[in-house]
Amino acid sequence: MSKKKPIVQYYDPFDLWPSIATDIESKIPLRNLQWVESYQYKKHTITSLDLEFLPWLEEFSSQDTSKDPTLLNIPLVNMLFLPEQDGEIYKTQHKPLATKWFQKVSKNENQSWMIVLVAEAQQAKRSNSLRRTHSRSSSYFAVKSTIDRVRGDFNTGNINHCVRLDYVRFGTPDAEGWNEFLKCLEWAVLSSLDSRFLQLSEQIRSIKLFDSSIFSDYLLFFLQKERLAASFFDLVLYRESLEQCEDMFSTLSKIISAIDGKKENISKYLGEGSDAQPDLKDFNSSFLILGSRYNTLHNLLADGDFTLFHFTLFLLSKIILLNLKISDYEKAFSTLQQALLFLTSSFFNEFVQNNLEIIAAFNYDCYTLLFKKITEAIHNNDTPIPLCCAKILLYARRQLTRMARWNNLIDDSSPLLWREPSFPLIEHHDNSLLDNRFQKLSETISSTSSFLSEYYRLSSEALSIFKAYKNRYSFVNTACDTGLAQYLLEDYENAYASLKNVDVQTAWSNDPLEEKWSKFYVDLLEKLEKFDEALEFASAISKGKVSIYNKNKILELSKKTAKSKVWNLDDFFTIEIPHMMAVVPHDDGINLSFMCESKVFDLESVDSVTCNYVLSSSKNPMNLLFTLHNSITDGKLNVHCNDIIPGRYHLKTIVFKLKDSVLSFQKDCLHSNKQIEVLNPTKHSNHLYILQSKISQQFQNDGIFACIPIMFGERFYKASCSEIKLSYIENSGFTNLEKSFLSEESHCGLESKTDSLVIKNIQKVPGVAKLYIPLTNTPVEGNEFLINLSYILESGQTVRFGKVLHIENAGIVEANCEKTNNMRDPLTSTIFLHIQPKEPIIFCSWNCMRKTKQGTYDNVFDIPYNIPVLSPMDCFTSCHFDSDMSIDLKFSMNCLRLADVVFMKLCVNIWERFDFIDIEHIMPLLDHACQQISLSNITQGTVVLPEEIRKLNGKKILNSFFDNEELRNEFSEFIQHLESEVSFNSLRSFVQEFEKKERLKNLPFYFSLHQTIGPLPFKDEMQSTTIEYIWKIPQKVLLNKPTEITLTFLRSLTHSKKEKQGQSFEIFYNFPAYTTTILFAGPTQRKIVWEKNQTTAQEQVTAVFLTAGRVMLPEVVVHSKDDDISILKNTKYTLVGRPLNDQPDLDYAP
């Protein structure tokens, strides 16, 4: 599309142009013209409009322009130059000439005109009729009179067509003169443009196109549209020109759609011969990208090439060129793709199939030429390269790859074709035509190395663009292609460097070609002798998948490296481990069976398996080490351990090792729920153990102790030495180990050391040894700790194991004691016990101890109760005390959780019925079920057993307890017929019976679930401080009148025989600032500090009473952090009177 300058035609009868041409042309081009089109009121901004000044030619102005390719072929403006003379010369000589010229130019449609009056320094000879001498001033005014006459003679309407250029006053026209000239010229240009565009737009609008329209209608429409587009182009309005071309292509697309792929319909819409097939000479990239073949549609018609093929490419070439002009490179690229896709339409199917290689070469040339034009444009404009350039390079690379395949430079299995879509193959092709028309491309595909070099160049340039735009997906794919090209060029180091820039494992993880890419990458690493990295990569891509690289390849790589490799077991093996198993050791140890499978390796290749079970502890863990008992068969893994230590273990690690390989696979299971519980040894074993995990707190010897029952197996004394060492972790709440002791029935001694306790001098197997270890001075709530036991067997083996113990929560109940005096007998006092249970308990006894002068404690009283307590209750007793004896009293209470009593009763009942089974198996399940007991389970003196107890009847549980079906059925029937409710009386009887020693000796297990709550908070009324407040109000109080009120606080020490010296404390008070009857102003809330010996405190407030009559003052809320301070309420009323209406304001009403 060639650009033409708009024309201004000038008429110069007095030869003025040579002297002023330079000045006028220096003002051109016109800048920033604002044109509002009259047709659609569209606003256009012409940034720069160059004009061509041509001398007057009458035929040129009046010629027929209907066939011109642009609206600018004829002059836009006709201009007349006249010299400036006096009025007489103008009237007799210049005006007739100007009038004759004006009559000619005014007949030309769509052309503007203007008259330029030029005042020269050497003026023409004046007329002889002017006989007087003119001064400069009179000449100036005469000249002014001349331009006014010209305007009066020729101007029409309010438009000024006449301007003056003054070369007399300053040798050149001033700025005002030039502005007037340019303004007139701009108006004339825009007026002509608007008129012409309006006329052409109306002509196009009058063309009605229908499905039944004939060829001539469509052709006229396209010709007029092209004139409009070309005219916009000449005015540097590229976007407007592009809009017209796109409108033309939209209409052509509708025609193509109506043709419906039938050649016989092409002639109907585009005329005879328009269905002709293209010729090979038409495939020139400059025709499509640069539009160099046909400038206008008239040229296309004149050459007889108006076919569907030529016309479509003609329009698309215009659109590509205009998009390049406006720097819309992405749109230019998409238009090129649209044009190349059009070549593959069904209209040209036969031609395409016969010329696949030529079309591919043409496509390659078009992509490379477009890339070249874009890079040249951005280089001139100093702008960043657009992202579409990378896509252009990749499309060019695709065409290049196809031609390389057709020339047998690569075969169908080449990795360069992995990502490429399928394309037809050419059995016989002639390179002579390709050599003649695409010589440079022919050289590129003359050899494999030249092709790969060009492939690498295109890929690397695209890669740099993707990298600049941080387009991760395209960058990764192109980096892989670049590395692949370098690999095929045997440049392995650079290929490795290209692939290291991306995470190839992640990039290929979801790629359908993952296996091919992975093999290529491993081969590259092997060529570089990076065997360790190749092995790691091969293992990473094989995780959990049906062997991309089978075991043979991985094993082969593992033999090339000397480093041992430990991989995650879950990535290659699947092991089904039960969440919880209760296991019973046999004579030779413990056997465990798991299901195992692998998608990568054969299980026969596993050489060894090691399972490490750890006793739950953060320090000094105790281990059970299981090893492979035999080979893995039928997907079943059998492991064995002969180191039998009772306790609950969680799985820590599993390690698999392959045969003849440095590879091993490990699974870490810290904090795992994959657990086993070794419940034995029981009473028949040669071990000792701690059965209970819940440890009670008891108040003994003026302190709180944890009672730990240690169970001894029947053969323990024969199988071990006479010492047992106990140690525990720090921060367990234990203190003063030297105060630890054993119960009297333990029949052994105890020695305390710095960090451990030693049970020694075991005279006989005691069954149970109750160990009391002192805790801190306050009850410990919910504290867990690990206690470790160790002893040496007769065989010399040292057995070490631990037990996680949970100190039973002492917060199951809140209790305190309070003492009041008997006024009649000062030495007799009443002691109250206030109990606030947090869950159902059995209150066993209430104890009081007194410290003697020797530092020991004697019992004052020990009152048994053995009653259930479900809600707050108070107990009291009367005691005889000396004067100050109360300060040395220690109170405590013993209780049992109701849930624990039910648990003990159920355990005993089961043991009595099934004394031949190990009750330890079922105890954890019973305990868990009984913990569900709450207040909702208690009705009318009975405890409703939780439904969880019935679940012990499950098949899995029964199978784990009993070996034969008869015992399973008997136990199932026993559970089924358990009473659903247990009375409080039966529970009380059970507790009393259970505490008898004879009964305890026959049990194979031991309970120590009594909770001792103490020392209890104790409050002595004799030493309590009392705070009383008093409202002091004036005698007369009036309605709605401010009244000063005093709030007085009084302090007294009730029945105190001696007050602690120097004691001070704080109280806090507050009362509402507003009630329905009183409004207060003043400190309604405040803190008061009582100093030593201070007895009163006062606060002043102002009150306004809102109601007359008897009014009650608000209650003052007083509280203190000191529990020994009592608050006495003092309710106060006052009478509020009404003031008389005729009385003046007084402080008090009469």
From Swiss-Prot:
One GO cellular component term noted in the UniProt record for this chain: TRAPPII protein complex
InterPro entries found in the cross-reference section: TRAPPC10/Trs130, TRAPPC10/Trs130_N
Pfam families: TRAPPC10_1st
Domain of life assignment: Eukaryota
GO terms, biological process: early endosome to Golgi transport; intra-Golgi vesicle-mediated transport; intracellular protein transport
Coiled coil region boundaries: none
PANTHER family attached to this UniProt entry: EPILEPSY HOLOPROSENCEPHALY CANDIDATE 1/TMEM1 (PTHR13251), TRAFFICKING PROTEIN PARTICLE COMPLEX SUBUNIT 10 (PTHR13251:SF3)
Family membership: Belongs to the TMEM1 family.
Protein name as catalogued: Uncharacterized protein CC285.14
